[in-house]
């Protein structure tokens, strides 16, 4: 019985090492864009605060002080470059975004760049958005943002009130994108291998499985 017991002990230890939470891994960073640096009709992007929790959920809090609510003509798009390469994703050569977190008035959508075009048909469960106190909050788990530990991002806002929409961008066009490092335990990105999940299901007292 030594062999099975030893194998079970190794599996149990591996479960705990892989799946047990690591405290204090959350992270946050502030960013700033100039106030009133765009046409008055545009949603004015100013302070941006990005954070993540230990589960790898990344939240973008975007201050728009000239809006108490988003108008039906307002569009805000947050573009994420997950691989840091301008030659991949959409808008190649300029930014290369793989993901887009968008809001049009009160409709929140999640986009993936598929073969150079945006696909907004599949919304991940981790994605969500809200607007309150002149602050737009967009959230998604980094697993749904390519699983990268460093995310490069840009934000664009527009108000389509006529033939000539008003825009604001953060950071400004012609400057480098902002970058955020996600600090979270490995299990926030990695799913345990099949054999380990099976061992943990059979011996729950020795393992703590996190549902995915």
Per-segment meaning from a language model:
Residues 113-145:
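Acidic, glycine-rich flexible loop segments
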Residues 26-107, 160-167:
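Surface-exposed, glycine/proline- and aromatic-rich loop segments on solvent-exposed faces
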Residues 9-21:
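Bacterial N-terminal signal peptides
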Residues 82-98, 144-201, 205-212:
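Acidic/polar low-complexity flexible segments
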Residues 89, 106-117, 152-155:
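Short, well-ordered strand-loop elements centered on a beta-strand within folded domains, enriched
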Residues 1-11:
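Bacterial N-terminal signal peptides that target proteins for export
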Residues 55-57, 73-77, 98, 124-128, ...:
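Extracellular structured ligand-interaction cores
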Residues 56-58, 106-109, 134-136, 207:
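Hydrophobic residues embedded in beta-strands of well-ordered beta-sheets
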């Amino acid at each position: 019985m030594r062999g099975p017991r030893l194998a079970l002990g190794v599996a149990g230890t591996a479960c705990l090492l892989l799946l047990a939470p690591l405290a204090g891994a959350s992270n946050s960073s502030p960013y700033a864009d100039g106030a009133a640096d765009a046409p008055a009709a545009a949603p004015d992007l100013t302070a941006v605060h990005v954070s993540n929790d230990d589960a790898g959920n990344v939240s973008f809090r975007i201050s728009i002080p000239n809006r108490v609510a988003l108008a039906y003509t307002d569009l805000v798009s947050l573009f994420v470059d997950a691989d840091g390469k301008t030659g991949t994703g959409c808008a190649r050569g300029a930014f290369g975004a793989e993901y887009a977190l968008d809001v049009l008035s009160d409709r929140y959508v999640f986009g993936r760049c598929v073969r150079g075009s945006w696909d907004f048909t599949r919304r991940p469960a981790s994605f969500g958005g809200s607007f309150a106190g002149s602050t737009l909050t967009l959230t998604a788990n980094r697993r749904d943002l390519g699983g990268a530990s460093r995310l490069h991002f840009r934000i664009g806002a527009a108000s389509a009130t006529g033939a000539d929409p008003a825009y604001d961008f953060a950071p400004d066009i012609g400057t480098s994108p902002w970058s955020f490092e996600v600090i979270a335990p490995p299990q926030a990105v990695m799913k345990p291998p099949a054999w380990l999940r099976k061992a943990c299901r059979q011996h729950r007292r020795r393992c703590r499985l996190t549902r995915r």
